[in-house]
Every structure is written in structure tokens, then in C-alpha cells.
Amino acid sequence: MREVVSLNVGQAGGQIANSCWELYCLEHGIQPDGYLTEERKAADPDQGFNTFFSETGQGKYVPRTIYCDLEPNVVDEVRTGPYRALFHPEQMITGKEDASNNYARGHYTVGKEMIDQCLDKVRRVADNCSGLQGFLVFHSFGGGQGSGFGALLMERLSVDYGKKTKLEFCVYPAPQNATSVVEPYNSILTTHTTLEHSDVQFMVDNEAIYDICRRNLGIERPSYENSNRLMAQGQSPITAIMLLFDCALNVDLNEFQTNLVPYPRIHFPLASYSPVVSAGKASHESNSVMEVTIVCFEPNNQMVKCDPRNGKYMATCLLYRGDVVPKDVHAVAATLKTKRTVQFVDLQPTGFKIGICYQPPTMVPNGDLAKVNRACMLSNTTAISEAWTALSHKFDLIYSKRAFVHWYVGEGMEEGEF
């Protein structure tokens, strides 16, 4: 079996993971206490569980996941929340003081004390796997723990599990709504550190997600819960097709790397997801395979604020969920190739990697989204440089005044690292 261990670092990692596990449990018919529902037991047992869940002797399913947080708030919500019986209590690791938005605290001072405990738990979970495929790491770039501790964790995973694939789902600092003033420092430092250690980094920014919620779902003031559920839906085709279900065209963890990353350092694919429609509107729209796919190429459906029309595509991967026929998908791919609106770089052939999963997407009860066939597009495009350009410009602005640098130096960094 090909298992995957997911690691959730910091507040953003923990909260996104909560939404993802809620979704995985619904998809597999696993109750919040870890046991299967009656309908699920009666149905054909599906072996896709083992990728993300390990089964105990009593028939309980335990997620292969580890929560690491330097302060206990987010993990305490899990410990007291509806899914408290699902997770193994030892796999939730919390410290007493947070990294206070400081990369150096997460990476050098506070993070150093927790990293061995964290890796010990990772080793235990990994030893339970018969064929560990790799790691999914959820964290943010802007916070102190997501950036500092996340980078430290990636470095140590590379040492201990060199050949295993490491996929990251990162919350990237949004251009307009920032949560802290030192986000550019943290993001640039963590990107520089993890560039060699990460295989693929899927970037998401909150502003793009909020815009999708406002525009397509009619939520005036989206909360983190709305955005995290949308992110979970956006990454569920990736995990479902890759691992969980028996699919027409299956994709493996290593295949993402092979198909999306032409050069090891250019590993920042853009994710886009369609259709994002509320339950009220869904019955009035046709949502054909063609429409759903073309919407994926629109700039306002990307999960990062950048315009793919300004760049060229290096590689594209189309993942479908629901009642989708391969014939339609190939017709769509042929149409896109002739259209020339989708510009590929000259050195790459215009090919689309395609995955189809017949299991329709599962919706959270009373959630925002309607149950329709979905497409998720992962593309490695040169347009992502817009996001980095904006960020490095902010970094230069703050660093030219040496603002806030003393906080980092005081925690054991050297100014030369900037």
C-alpha cells in the first residue's frame, strides 16, 4: 500500500487540516469517532482508506497525521472538538509559547526545542507504513511557526527521508490583506530555506480565496472556515485522484513531480478549481466538461492572485471528479490545443496530464458548495512570478530601512542571512 503522512504546522496548517480531515472522513464514510458508518460497512470495502488512515484491531481508523504547533490554541480546539476521538492524542504536539510571527523563533530558538519530539512522532507513524510514499505538509509562509518551524521540519525530513516525495500546501501572503507586517521577511526566508528540500509547493492566498467566496458563493464576509473548506475542496481532487479512490486515470505522488516540475527549483504550480457554485445556483447551470475546464483557465478562478494570461504554461495537469467520460476530456484537451489562448513555452510539448476519479465530490453538510462534477487544474506557469515579484518588492522596501531586523537578530539569526 502507498501511504502518505500529513504534517500540519502552525495555526494555518492546523485549521486547513481540520477542514481536510472533515472532508476525508465524509468521503470514506468514517464517523467522527473513527468507526465506519453502517452504510459504509455494508458497501464494498474500499482499500483507499489505508493511504491516509491506519486501521486498529478494533476496526477504528486513525489518521496518519501529526499536528505541530508551538502554542496550544488551535490544537486544543481539535482536542475538544467533534473529531477529538478520531486523532491519536500523541500525534498532537503543542508547546507553551508561540513564534510570534518571527521566522527566527520558529526556526532557531523555540522550534529547536520541539523538532526532535515532532520527528520522533513522524518516525512512529512512518514505521507503521508498509510503503511510505511521501509527506504532505500544510503550513503558511507569513507566520513565524509556519515559516520557521515549517522550514526546519522540511530540512530534517530531507535528512531522515531523503528519497520520499514532499508536497507542500502553503498559504502565501495575500497582496492586500496582511495579518502581520513582517510577512515578506518570513516568506522569503522560508522559501529560500525550503527551495532545495521541497518537491512541489502548491500555493494558495487568502485574498484570492476570499474573492472566489464573495463572487461565486455570495458570502459577503468570508471567514477562515469558508476559505479553509474551499481550500480543502480544492486539494481534495489532488489527494483523491492520487491516492484514495480507484480511478480511471490514476496519478501517483511522484507523478506530480514528474509532470509539473520541469526544473527542480521551479516547483510552484498554480491550482485552480471549478465550478465554485452555491447549491441555489447549481441547478440552473449546465456545467459541461468543456465549460468547467475553460473556467479553470480564467484568472479570477486561480487560488493565487496572478494572471496566467501574462505568462506561459510549462506543464498542465487536469483532474476531474464525478461523472466525467474520458472521451469528453480528450475532446476538451484537443480544443484547448487548437485555441492557442493557452500559451505553452516553446521547449515543452502542449500536453495535458489528465486524471479522472468517478467518485463524485463529497460536500460538507450545510456547507457553501453544490454537489456537481468538478475540475481541478494544476499548472506550472511563468505567471506565478507576479506573486514573487510583489513579495520581493515589499521585502526590499522594509529591508532598506532595516525595519524589524533586530527581532530576528535577537533570536539568533545573522543579518547576513537576509
Curated annotation (Swiss-Prot):
It comes from the Eukaryota. Coiled coil: none annotated. GO terms for biological process: microtubule-based process. GTP binds at residues 11, 71, 140, 144, 179, 206, 228. The active site is at residue 255. Mg(2+) binds at residue 71. It is found in: Cytoplasm, Cytoskeleton. The keyword GTP-binding applies. Keywords: Cytoplasm, Cytoskeleton, GTP-binding, Hydrolase, Magnesium, Metal-binding, Microtubule, Nucleotide-binding. GO terms for molecular function: GTP binding; hydrolase activity; metal ion binding; structural constituent of cytoskeleton. It catalyses: GTP + H2O = GDP + phosphate + H(+). Its EC number is 3.6.5.-. Its cofactor is Mg(2+). One of its GO terms (cellular component) is cytoplasm. Tubulin is the major constituent of microtubules, a cylinder consisting of laterally associated linear protofilaments composed of alpha- and beta-tubulin heterodimers. Microtubules grow by the addition of GTP-tubulin dimers to the microtubule end, where a stabilizing cap forms. Below the cap, tubulin dimers are in GDP-bound state, owing to GTPase activity of alpha-tubulin. Dimer of alpha and beta chains. A typical microtubule is a hollow water-filled tube with an outer diameter of 25 nm and an inner diameter of 15 nM. Alpha-beta heterodimers associate head-to-tail to form protofilaments running lengthwise along the microtubule wall with the beta-tubulin subunit facing the microtubule plus end conferring a structural polarity. Microtubules usually have 13 protofilaments but different protofilament numbers can be found in some organisms and specialized cells. Belongs to the tubulin family. This is Tubulin alpha chain. It comes from Ajellomyces capsulatus. The gene is TUB1.
